[in-house]
């Protein structure tokens, strides 16, 4: 009997050890030696005319595999012929053999259909001063710009030069009236031109629907062997933020929304305050809202209904849409963040990633041109010069890096080594950042990231997204199965009565709401209206901790200039914190972690794959939080992992 009991005990221990080993293999070993799957980096390649028919593309795919990439985004000309289709079919088959997943850039057009597809257009304008010299002639400066062939006139207007308070009735429409000959005039020419490179118009609803549907049918038919298994996504190019999108029915849509004649106020878009400052602000605001509504109804919904239902995922850069970054993931399941050191760009990144997490999007892409990135002063200390750019994207919320290598992978060995080292580093990070689910229990409605909530792991939302949510047992729930215990609202987001009503409705259904205002009188007045409302707490400016909800990670450091950002994810077996030192100087930082499982923190280094137990200056507080002192080098990043 003793022998039998001992055997049973040994069996139980062996099974337990096996379970631990399996768990280690599941994450520890994956971190040290990352698996060959979708946790790998993507590379963007440009397939120029004639290249798809040669071995060049196959060699590029093999080189992508050799640097450690796991996917490619292939950009092809807008119009394609049979040779290009066949070349893409071979490229997809070769990608399947190499274990690469593929995305295609934009919805290419067959040559025979090229004239049937409307092209995306942008608004352009010019301004010149014209001086009348006689009853029949005017003195004009020489023309220094020739419109391109795609130019279409929108409006030709004149206004008295020097008018300090220009009103709409003072504008003269020169399309059917001659220019007056008394005095000097400012002449405005507004028109639209096609974007370069050419792309399909996202605002032509019927044409866009028909073309995307035809493209999906063609790819399903031609790439039957790889569609949905190797070909997984499509990237859609929009208007950049320096291009003013011009839908064909923009004036009519603007009139319907605002009640104003856009032609009489077009100079406002060129910076001329027609009607005074408040009217000009009204015009700009409603022009932007008109574009957002048209984009949602035509481009966003079309892509969502067609591409996603056809089994692919759509991607778009968050700086190529007119809607708020936070809601890009509502229509495009792979929002693309943009690598930048500028805080306003990174703020948009964080909002877009927060919205994508709310919507349950697995892949948040991070667009990075490694050889165009300006290296930091600490670059000589880094394993590859653009490491900090990768870390910034990951800290902003990206879960998969997309490397823009300039269209083709170079044969230069130094560049190859850089890319290989960078891919391995990003691969280890992505193994961790695609694990489990975001740990945030807090939802934030704000038009910008709130520095006062920097210690929280939170997801983001706007009013459009909140309208789709439900409430059960005091928790906000989404179709993605993400749910939240509370909502923090910035006063600046509550510009309209409908927004306030939405917040009050959520609070009346048991949702905890924290109202936050900056040092601004109007914002303080807005949040003060919620004082005394059940489940609503009005917070003073710059308060760092929400009553009733502990922060995920609080840090402090004596090192000058130290700035730490973090991400927090949770799996069935681990609490995972990603820490980044934004400073170009090294230093020690003391972090207090809220969710700590068994309380033994480990440091996982993505540069080397090494894992070590943190033992120095580590303490566990009575409330379960763990405080640990961690040394971070210049632009250093690491994971702190707790077993659960």
PLM features per residue range, with description:
Residues 37-39, 43-44, 51-58, 71-76, ...:
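Carbohydrate-binding surfaces of carbohydrate-active enzymes
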Residues 10-19:
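Bacterial N-terminal signal peptides
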């Amino acid at each position: 009997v003793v022998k039998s009991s001992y055997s049973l005990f040994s069996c139980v221990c062996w099974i337990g050890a096996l379970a631990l080993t399996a768990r280690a293999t599941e994450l520890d070993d994956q971190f040290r030696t990352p698996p060959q799957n979708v946790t790998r980096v993507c590379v963007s390649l440009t397939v120029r005319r004639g290249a798809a028919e040669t071995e060049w593309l196959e060699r590029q795919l093999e080189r992508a595999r050799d640097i450690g990439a796991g996917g490619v985004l292939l950009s092809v000309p807008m119009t394609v012929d049979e040779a290009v289709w066949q070349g893409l079919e071979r490229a997809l088959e070769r990608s399947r053999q190499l274990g690469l997943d593929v995305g295609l850039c934009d919805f290419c057009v067959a040559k025979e259909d090229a004239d049937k597809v409307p092209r995306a257009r942008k608004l352009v304008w010019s301004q010149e001063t014209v001086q009348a010299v006689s009853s029949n002639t005017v003195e004009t400066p020489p023309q220094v710009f020739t419109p391109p062939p795609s130019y279409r006139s929108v409006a030709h207007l004149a206004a008295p030069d020097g008018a300090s308070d220009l009103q709409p009735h003072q504008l003269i429409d020169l399309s059917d009236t001659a220019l007056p000959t008394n005095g000097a005039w400012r002449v405005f020419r507004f028109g639209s031109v096609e974007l370069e490179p050419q792309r399909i118009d996202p605002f032509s609803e019927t044409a866009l629907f028909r073309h995307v549907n035809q493209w999906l049918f063609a790819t399903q038919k031609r790439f039957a062997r790889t569609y949905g298994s190797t070909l997984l996504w499509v990237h859609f190019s929009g208007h950049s933020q320096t291009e003013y999108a011009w839908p064909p029915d923009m004036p009519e849509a603007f009139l319907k929304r605002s009640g104003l004649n856009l032609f009489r106020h077009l100079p406002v878009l060129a910076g001329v305050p027609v009607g005074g400052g408040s009217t000009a602000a009204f015009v700009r605001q409603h022009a932007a809202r008109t574009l957002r509504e048209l984009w949602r109804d035509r481009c966003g919904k079309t892509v969502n209904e067609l591409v996603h239902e056809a089994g692919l995922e759509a991607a778009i850069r968050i700086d190529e849409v007119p809607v708020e970054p936070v809601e890009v993931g509502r229509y495009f399941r792979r929002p693309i963040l943009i690598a930048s050191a500028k805080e306003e760009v990174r703020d948009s990144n964080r909002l877009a990633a927060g919205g994508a997490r709310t919507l349950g999007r697995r892949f948040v892409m991070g667009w990075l041109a490694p050889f165009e990135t300006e290296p930091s002063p600490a670059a000589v200390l880094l394993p590859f010069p653009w490491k900090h750019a990768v870390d910034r994207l990951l800290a902003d919320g990206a879960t998969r890096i997309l490397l823009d290598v300039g269209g083709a992978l170079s044969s230069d060995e130094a560049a190859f080594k850089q890319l290989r080292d960078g891919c391995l580093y990003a691969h280890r990070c992505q193994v961790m950042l695609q694990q489990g689910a975001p740990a945030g229990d807090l939802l934030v409605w704000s038009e910008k990231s709130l520095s006062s909530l920097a210690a929280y792991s939170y997801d983001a939302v706007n009013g459009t997204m909140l309208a789709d949510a439900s409430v059960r047992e005091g928790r906000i729930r989404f179709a993605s199965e993400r749910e939240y215990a509370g909502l923090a609202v910035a006063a600046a987001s509550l510009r309209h009565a409908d927004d306030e009503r939405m917040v009050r409705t959520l609070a009346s259904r048991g949702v905890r709401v924290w109202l936050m205002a900056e040092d601004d009188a109007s914002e303080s007045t807005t949040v003060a209206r919620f004082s005394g409302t059940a489940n609503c707490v009005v917070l003073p400016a710059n308060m760092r901790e929400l009553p009733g909800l502990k922060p995920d990670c609080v840090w402090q450091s004596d090192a000058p200039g130290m700035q730490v950002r973090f991400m927090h994810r949770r799996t069935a077996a681990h609490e995972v914190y990603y820490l980044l030192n934004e400073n170009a100087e090294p230093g020690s930082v003391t972090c207090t972690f809220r969710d700590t499982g068994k309380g033994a923190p480990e440091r996982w280094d993505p540069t080397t794959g090494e894992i070590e137990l943190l033992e120095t200056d580590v303490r566990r507080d009575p409330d379960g939080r763990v405080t640990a002192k961690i040394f971070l080098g210049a632009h250093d990043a690491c994971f702190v992992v707790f077993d659960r």
